[in-house]
A protein has these predicted regions:
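Substrate-binding rim/cap in mid-to-C-terminal beta-strand-loop elements of soluble/periplasmic
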Residues: 1-34
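Phosphate/adenylate-binding glycine loop and adjacent helical scaffold
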Residues: 36, 41-127
Length: 127
């Protein structure tokens, strides 16, 4: 829940987009008018940049990422599952040799996010 007296942000009603904790920092920087560069894997929920969301969850074995219309299961090396984003039970794995362009891009984004994250953890660059 966010508040701003600035009507520019139109913070009334319910926003049904997927969001997560990593979106708080960039959202707050926009709300307070901070316009210097920041490092975040999240996105501002009040920006008009229309940034794509990447929702990340981990069970300490696999990363689960929601990107676009799909949920990707990643084991640290390979994507092992692709599910429709409405298939929250992960019951129908769509992973196949005939991936559509969105799924191929989602796999690349999954691996890129993980590589960037691990590089920053290992090299102590989480700033």
């Amino acid at each position: 829940m966010f508040f701003s007296p600035n009507s520019k942000y139109n913070l009334k009603g319910i926003d049904d987009r997927f969001a997560q904790q990593i979106d708080i920092y960039p959202t707050l920087t926009d709300l307070i008018g901070y316009n210097k560069k920041i490092r975040s894997w999240g996105r501002s929920l009040v920006s008009d940049k229309n940034e794509d969301a990447i929702i990340v969850n981990s069970d300490a074995i696999n990363e689960q990422m929601i990107i676009g219309n799909y949920i990707y299961i990643f084991n640290g090396k390979d994507v092992t599952g692709i599910y429709d984003r409405t298939d929250l039970a992960l019951s129908k794995n769509l992973f196949s040799k005939n991936l559509n362009p969105e799924q191929k891009l989602g796999i690349l984004k999954t691996k890129a996010w993980y590589q960037d994250y691990m590089d920053r953890v290992i090299n102590r660059k989480l700033y």
